[in-house]
Every structure is written in C-alpha cells, then in structure tokens.
C-alpha cells in the first residue's frame, strides 16, 4: 500500500502506520549518515517554521533549530513571554495567523487538545514537540537509538519502561512499541499505568503488528532479559515541588539502580532516558530533593552509577532527536 507523509501533522503517532514509522526511521538513518559524511543536501530552502514553546526546552528546541538550519529552513522561536498566546489571543486565532506566514508549526506545551486545535486551524503541518499526553518526536529518536544499539530486528527487541507510566513517555513508548511489533513492558504502580482506553487501542495495534505488551507492578519481572531499560523523571515539568513526596513514595521501588540493571540477567542491557535526568544532586531541583530525602542524593529515578556507566546511551539518544526531527521535517515539507 502506498503512503504519503507530505504535509501531514505529527500529533501522537496514532495516525501513522507501521510502514510510515519505519520510513521515518530509515530516513533518519540516511540523514544522520549524510551529516556525518558531509554529503547532506538541503531540501528545505525557503521554508519558514514557527516553534511555539509554552514549556521550556533544551533538546527539543535545539534539535528543531539545528535540523531546520541544516536543511536550509528558517525558524522563529515563540514563547509566552514574547507573544500574545494565551494572554490576548487564543490558540485558534494564533493558528490562523501563523498558518498564513509559516510552512509548518511546532508546539511544545500542555494539553493534547491544544496541539490538536492548532493543527485543526493552522492549515499547515503541525508537529507535537511534547504535550502532557504524548511525545512523538522523542519516540522516533528512541527507536532509532535502540535499533543502532541492537543487532536484532525491531520485532525481536524488548524494552521496559519504569516509573510514572501515565505520562507522555509511558504513553508514547507503549504506543510506538505496539505499532512496530516490539516487546513492550511497562512497570509502574497500577494507579500510574496508562489509561485503559490507550491500553486497549495499543492491544489492537499489537494484534496487527505482533507486538507483545506487558503491564505489571513488578519492576524486576518487567526487566528480565530486556535489551533496554527506559525511565523518566517522577514529576513532570510544571508540577510543584510539593508533589514529590507522594510520588517518591509510589515510585521508589521503580528506581533504576545497579541492582535493577543486574536483575535483567542481560549484561548487554542499555539504559535510556529522554533527559533531563535527576541522577545526582548537582541541579537545583536535585539538591532540594536530596535535602528532604538524603537517600536520593545519588539519584532519584536513576542512580548516578547507572547513568555514568557504559550501559547509559542517553546522550546518543539525545543526539538522535536532531536527526529524527530532521527526517520529520524533510518527509513532511520537502519534495522528495
């Protein structure tokens, strides 16, 4: 069956087929190789891309900007402090303005409904750079990274996600694994599992792709024999420091530490994290938490010994944000 990603939105990956996702992965690989060998060709000259950031960002902003510049496109960075978004102008009206000036729009912010409203009214492709519910651009980078660090085909790769699984990373890792036929394991307290409706949809995708989906409250059972262990921060951006107490109580058994990595029984297991990571107390937030919870001074969701070990491929993963976002831009906007 033919497919066409040109001028398509990227909002959650739900509307992308397995074949389309594999195409994005292959294009990411090819563009990465071209950048490394100095043979990259610019396909986006004359394109203008708006980057809306209602949440702060390091990797997503840098990845979009460098990817666009490499391909000859121009970008405009827009945040709440430098625009009328949400203050004097609705997202609906913002979409109708920006859609007349730009060839595409990236949005990083809060509710999924906001990026969907933006896509509905902009009239140009919209890319979800992160919402509370989904993180699709991160997923393409994560799977590319897993493929680079495994000699197995995708359908034989297994990975576990530990921690708050109802957040954008838990939802998205479940979704893309189900779409690509992978062995996906989610380990979290039942109260923090992905919502039932998403789980049911992913089970349907798994029936089509051959994926294996496991949800469990047992972290050691989840990681047994896996190729990759993923985690994320226990409190998401924008949540108050007061929320940490209950979350730490819930998630301490799901901390990725040396004991947990050993319990995989696989010496080749790699550790992945979308970053930023609280793996020590050298950050402002890490220091605040360590003062209240001294046993977390050497790491919250992941301990420093794991993060600084050869098993950690989080920085390769971070670099791949740029290559995969470039593939998304090129496949959507270029005439290939």
From Swiss-Prot:
Short name of any one Pfam family annotated for the protein: OTCace_N
GO BP term, example: arginine catabolic process to ornithine
Alphabetical UniProt keywords: Arginine metabolism, Cytoplasm, Transferase
Subcellular location per the Swiss-Prot or TrEMBL entry: Cytoplasm
Source species, domain of life: Bacteria
Residue sites binding L-ornithine per the record: 168, 232, 236-237
The keyword Ribosomal protein is annotated on this UniProt entry: no
PANTHER family: ORNITHINE CARBAMOYLTRANSFERASE, ORNITHINE CARBAMOYLTRANSFERASE, MITOCHONDRIAL
Protein name per Swiss-Prot or TrEMBL: Ornithine carbamoyltransferase, catabolic
Organism: Pseudomonas putida (strain ATCC 47054 / DSM 6125 / CFBP 8728 / NCIMB 11950 / KT2440)
């Amino acid at each position: 069956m033919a497919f066409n990603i040109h001028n398509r939105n990227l909002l959650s990956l739900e509307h992308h087929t397995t074949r389309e996702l594999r195409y994005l992965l292959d294009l990411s690989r090819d563009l990465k190789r071209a950048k490394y060998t100095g043979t990259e060709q610019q396909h986006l000259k004359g394109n203008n891309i708006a980057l809306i950031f209602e949440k702060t960002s390091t990797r997503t902003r840098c990845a979009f900007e460098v990817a666009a510049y490499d391909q000859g496109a121009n970008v405009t960075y827009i945040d709440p402090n430098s625009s009328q978004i949400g203050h004097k102008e609705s997202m609906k009206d913002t979409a109708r303005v920006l859609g007349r000036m730009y060839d595409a729009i990236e949005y990083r912010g809060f509710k999924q409904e906001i990026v969907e409203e933006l896509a509905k009214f902009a009239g140009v492709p919209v890319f979800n750079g992160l919402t509370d519910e989904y993180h699709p651009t991160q997923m393409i980078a994560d799977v590319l990274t897993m493929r680079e660090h495994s000699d197995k085909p995708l359908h034989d790769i297994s990975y576990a996600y530990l921690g708050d699984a109802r957040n954008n990373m838990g939802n998205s890792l479940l979704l893309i694994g189900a779409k690509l036929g992978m062995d996906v394991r989610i380990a979290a307290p039942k109260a923090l599992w992905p919502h039932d409706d998403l789980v049911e949809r992913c089970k349907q995708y798994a029936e089509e792709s051959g994926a294996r989906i496991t949800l469990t409250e047992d972290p050691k059972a989840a990681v047994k024999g896996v190729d990759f262990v993923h985690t994320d921060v226990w409190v998401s951006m924008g949540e108050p420091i007061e929320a940490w107490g209950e979350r730490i109580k819930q998630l301490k058994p799901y901390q990725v530490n040396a004991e947990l990595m050993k319990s995989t029984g696989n010496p080749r297991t790699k550790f992945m994290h979308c970053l930023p990571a609280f793996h020590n107390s050298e950050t402002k937030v890490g220091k605040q938490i360590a003062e209240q919870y001294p046993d977390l001074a050497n790491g919250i969701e992941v301990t420093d010994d794991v993060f600084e070990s050869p098993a950690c491929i989080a920085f390769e993963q971070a670099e791949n944000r740029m290559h995969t976002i470039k593939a998304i831009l090129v496949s959507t906007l270029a005439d290939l």
